[in-house]
Design a protein with these regions (language model features):
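Polyanion/phosphate-binding surface patch
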Residues: 1-22, 60-61, 66-74
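Cationic, histidine-enriched alpha-helical/coil surfaces that engage anionic ligands
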Residues: 109-125
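Phosphate/anion-contacting hairpin/loop surfaces
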Residues: 28-62, 66
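Short secondary-structure boundary/hinge segments and terminal tails
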Residues: 50-51, 99-100, 122
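Residue-level "edge-of-site" marker
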Residues: 45, 94, 117
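Short, conserved charged micro-motifs
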Residues: 27-29, 76-80
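Mixed-charge, glycine-accented linear interaction segment located at domain edges/termini
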Residues: 78-114
Length: 125
């Protein structure tokens, strides 16, 4: 489970993150429910992770496209991006929800969530 704070202004998506493993997701769902919380967006992705000095490189396959996420120091990210033939002008700072909403609007998809079985066919989830 990950808490993600607000994005700081700048050419890269920088924000506080707190992460922990959840041994029983169903218990967490029940706790959230008892606290009055409801799921408002779900998404699926397949992730492969690689490492470069000081940078974690994640290759994310989602229902709306495949993306590379770089996590690490600014210098490390710029070095890896350059090695991949990319510059800060190529960086996507939007969230997966934002990417999904743009995809859904452009492709007349009515699904509420970014799931592999619903994004392509436009059905609701």
């Amino acid at each position: 489970m990950t808490f993600k704070g607000p994005v700081q202004p700048g050419p890269m998506k920088v924000r506080e993150e707190q992460e922990t493993e959840v041994s029983d997701p169903e218990v967490v769902r029940r706790v959230f429910h008892e606290l009055g919380m409801q799921a408002w967006f779900r998404y699926q992705k397949f992730r492969e992770e690689y490492e470069a000095p000081g940078v974690v490189i994640a290759l994310d396959e989602t229902p709306v496209g495949t993306y590379v996420e770089l996590e690490g120091s600014e210098e490390g990210i710029l070095t890896v991006a350059d090695a991949l033939g990319r510059s800060p002008a190529d960086f996507i700072l939007d969230s997966y929800r934002g990417l999904f909403l743009a995809f859904a609007q452009a492709n007349n998809v009515s699904a509420r969530d970014m799931l592999f079985d619903t994004a392509a066919d436009g059905t609701g989830a």
